[in-house]
């Protein structure tokens, strides 16, 4: 049989016959994509499960969908996610779909590579406290993503948020290193980034991701300059030992001199975070 769910709540008539479930509405009501449960199915007799399920619209076109059995399992895919705490805020607890997943997650810390379902909700709570914000995600099956906690709690200009981008973990060969760069300094202007004197990124603004790039596995001096200007800071990036791997390099802290001070950090695939040493001389 078939009953209930958001189809019934939206005024649909839902019925089942044989192997077909029909749902139709005389009011023209629709059900929002990705929201709620379409309908509940019950099995009679000796039936123990469902197979070969298809969902079609009124023109017999296939419609993508997700289904769950009584234990809550279903056809959700999986993706790979790394989470980085780059909000100058207190230590937090991270919840996934209401369950505590990361306890005591400190500023400038990172997880390793997590395997997660493609649809999930991240809850953020002060350490030991209740969840104060939820962030739903719907990602691609088989995809790889970095999620960065960024911005400032209670700030209207650069509010707290979870920024995410598709990326690649690892690299195409042992002689190159994969990089994803994130501008996470809330008071820093748009900048140009130089690697050993050559422009790597230009007009790179707060909240921007670079997109995945590969560079030769070597040690670099990264210069940071106001967009269109001369470098005002330099950092050493010892990447020679990371061939075949990758890192997420993120700008962090305040350029104004407030604590925590501005710096560049690199999150490795295993969750280790390296602070890139600042250079005193011009670069």
What do these predicted regions represent?
Residues 77-283:
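Intrinsically disordered, low-complexity polar regions and short flexible loop motifs
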